[in-house]
Amino acid sequence: EIVVRDGVFTPNRIEVPAGRRVKLVLINEGPGPLEFENDEMHIEKVLSAGARSFVVLPNLKPGEYDFIDEFNPITGELKVIAKADGQ
């Protein structure tokens, strides 16, 4: 689960297995809306205050992927690190 409060992701960095689809559960505990976004993957999810939802990431190659809260781009950053087995 990833909690977003006042434009800050907790945790703000997660590791996932490369080559597998991954479900991320998002919980917006902030007073306003959240727009979870990654342009490269064409992922965009808007959550109202107090809402809970999820996104499914595609099979990722090993590497780092950045997601933002479009409404709070300076503080709202989440780094997803896809690791191959044994890394």
Predicted regions and their residues:
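Extracellular/periplasmic metallocenter environments
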Residues: 1, 47-87
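N-terminal edge beta-strand
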Residues: 1-21
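Beta-strand-rich interaction surfaces with strong enrichment in secreted/lumenal proteins
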Residues: 12-14, 42-46
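Short beta-strand/loop motifs in extracellular/secreted proteins, especially
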Residues: 22, 32-34, 76
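Asparagine-centered strand-capping/turn motif at beta-strand->loop junctions
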Residues: 26-28
